[in-house]
């Protein structure tokens, strides 16, 4: 064989092999890892502009993926939010719109569907979703003594011992950064004296200590994410793994967790998929109910009608393209009686407060915090500014309306501004359509306060003992759920998009 014939033969061989590799890469089902943090706000990662918190691994990873600037949760409450993500349904459509409630056992989850289609599915860390969700996992690590203080202890072990012939779906759910804070090797990572609290908190020593401990737990979450990414690369599966990093609700401080504004329901969301080299930043409006359909879309699985969200896969190929016209959120009972609804479009946010006679102090863990104590004391002495004392207003406005381009933290309520009358009416109309189409309701007898909201009945640095002291006569008694009268758990309508 001549030299040139050999050269041509070898070249064709390598071309054929390369083509085969590309074909296999494109046809092979992707793996999925969802890192879901506990109580971390959208702007508490470095890659979202926070220069005080230390998140080097997440920041580095974000440079290899797509940062979502407008990913909205459907609620700012732990179990309702997680169930909403897992089912792709609004909280009142899951049958579990309140904290510590569970969807019916026959509810369909994305883990369920993935498992049925050959995926190896694991939940490791905080579970908090209910029995229906257990059906969807081959393996569950949900015991604190096994998972470690941050809930991340088994993450590497799960990856190392997975069946290598199967694609996988990992639901890696950290306890970080939920109160109470604990002591670990990450404690002291952030110096309180070098921190400046958000403008709605008091800038005093004990608030800075509170914030530093919160940031320390975020740093632990970041470290664990980095460990998993390194292991994916070691195994050679990083490129074919779609990684999502997010939180279930806002930070556990006053003005944040349980709110339906950006500090409560806007989540950090980073998606990395090296096989498609998705890079950049998207401003598109996306809802957390869209996550499950997107995962199923990438897995080439038909998306059933029970999923109210829609796949945002097309947004990934063109991040500048708009996705949703509207996102919706709801706040129902979380320690205290509540009923709020929110809708936002590209430019405006409208909030409906249906229990506006109740001051919006925050959840129980926030009320028992050092940060709240400072706010409470300085409110009595009249030392708070307008933003800080907002949580004590009673009654609150029945309605709120914000211009989002110039009011990123929703400080200037424009509901009485006649210049925005048309925009206000438009969003009110859309919200009402959403309520009707998805079967939402406002029950007369909602679940009432399970705990007192008066500081002073607490045991410092012991939330569990404080809870016992703060229980009311209504503790343990549930009222009617939003959507219950309309059997919303059986309604699959997606609502306005």
Positions of predicted regions on the chain:
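Short, charged, surface-exposed hinge/linker loops at domain edges
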Residues: 443-457
